[in-house]
């Protein structure tokens, strides 16, 4: 089975975690993230050759946006140019991928995980505790493909949440959050199992997700489940002042 390419995963990410608006101009793709975080707010290069950095800096300043760039595989020239202009690396990210069938368990623990749309109030509270607030909930509502929110319990207590959406053969998992007092109790594994069941039931051959390189616990979990790192990206940022 041929795995999706890095470009295909980027398409799936855009579909399942969309900016409010995007447009291309002067060799750049410019996003309005509406407060939804770096991934939907960062500028990316939209051509092979290096575009005019001074132009995009001036444009971002006019728009009142951060000078924030996403650097993907193949963007090495842009990365070096931004470094020379004083932009610092922030939040290196690893992309993980796995065949859905490999993640789906034979059965799920009874009454320990659920697929729910729209998110319940308690789910919003768990997300908020992890810094995922209303702009990102609004982002989830913007997704136009099949989607669901995930809830997992620890015993009888709601303890973890996630968001899953489909783009063709790929189900992308986003916004995984487990309350600190319930970590290392298997809650994230329950979320992953429920996500895999939903994904396979909806025809997804693959499940993908991303996490920061510094999130040791998440990287350990995804590797232990048989997910493979298949790509990476990072951001470069500079105070527009």
How would you describe each model-predicted region?
Residues 1-62:
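N-terminal charged segments
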Residues 36-43, 90, 165-174, 183:
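A conserved beta-turn-beta hairpin within the catalytic core of GNAT-like acetyltransferases
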Residues 138-179:
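A conserved beta-strand-loop-helix scaffold within acyl/acetyltransferase catalytic domains
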Residues 1-12, 42-46, 93, 101-136:
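Short amphipathic alpha-helix that is part of the acyltransferase structural core
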Residues 50-57, 178, 184-197, 201, ...:
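Conserved acetyl-CoA-binding loop-helix of GNAT-fold acetyltransferases
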Residues 63-73, 199-210:
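Conserved GNAT acetyl-CoA-binding A-motif
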Residues 70-77, 209-219, 236-240:
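Conserved beta-strand-loop-alpha-helix junction that forms the acyl-donor binding cleft
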Residues 83-90, 223-232:
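Conserved acetyl-CoA-binding loop of GNAT-fold acetyltransferases
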